[in-house]
């Protein structure tokens, strides 16, 4: 008897990566996305060797090389005076040590690469404007109902629907969101609008007082992507993501150096996110339902591992499904397999944010001095991330 398709909720990075991996192995899938079209947000993402290896193994090497940037170096600098605290060769080191390069790209470019590859295999399996309403687990299948009251049956339902996951809400009805007192500003600037000192600068992390700012080129160097995080006491809006006010952005980073000021001055429409912690995500899985990516384990953007972790989830889950003909019974194994690494990534990301945001002058001096001295002796940035980058899903 032919198996019912696996139902994937969400056409983001985790959902599309999972779908592509399964389709390449002749597993039927259906993808349902609540938005009316494929995501077109211009936010930048890091694709470190642990993510690059996945894309290459999916046959996407040429495509990602044609759209993304390979940074030569990365720098850590003081937010106020621009003093260079640490500098690390990135791509030669990554390719020599981990066999795969480090990319920086626009999120929508990666989404479109995955989307186009899926459409080559089957252009009739992605449905837009379908928001999950509920699902019911039956003996041999799962019945899924959408907000348009259409119903679909599948063998499994996989929630790849991000931080506001509807699948997670059903699996974990007691889970609640809590504002982390951090907001993130994002934007892109045309490289032609910026002065030479900025266009020639390596990807840089600027470490300030209860704030930090990161920028790097994307889209083969035609655009500069930035993300800035700052501590806030409250987030009043119902939406976690919205267009931001440029004057508020200037106010949040008002005491910055001239480079950050110029980047902010040239951004057209900045976006801002309230960063929320999701409490009590106890269950990633039931017998026929599973959540992956941000739906299962949201993390702060301060380690640049959100997209990579989502791709890791997708590939590992695809292998579990492929190795078990009765895969409906093996979803619990996924959580057991992934939880340790994910928790370590979340803790490391939170730790990075604390280091980037240090306010105490004495502690800041000690840490900044330590970074400066250690960087002269050992590749401190790469050493800190080695356990992440060497992972091969």
Which residue ranges define each predicted feature?
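Conserved N-terminal helical subregion
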Residues: 2-6, 48-190, 233-250, 393
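Residues at the starts of beta-strands that form the adenosine-phosphate
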Residues: 5, 28, 223-226
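Conserved mid-domain beta->alpha element of the FAD-binding
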Residues: 11-32, 158-159, 185, 215, ...
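Conserved Rossmann-like nucleotide-cofactor binding loop
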Residues: 14, 37, 164
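A short coil-to-beta-strand element that immediately follows conserved catalytic motifs
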Residues: 178-182, 198-202, 258-274
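Active-site substrate-recognition segment that forms the wall
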Residues: 201-236, 253, 275
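Flavin-binding catalytic cores
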Residues: 239-271, 327
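C-terminal auxiliary extensions adjacent to catalytic cores
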Residues: 371-393
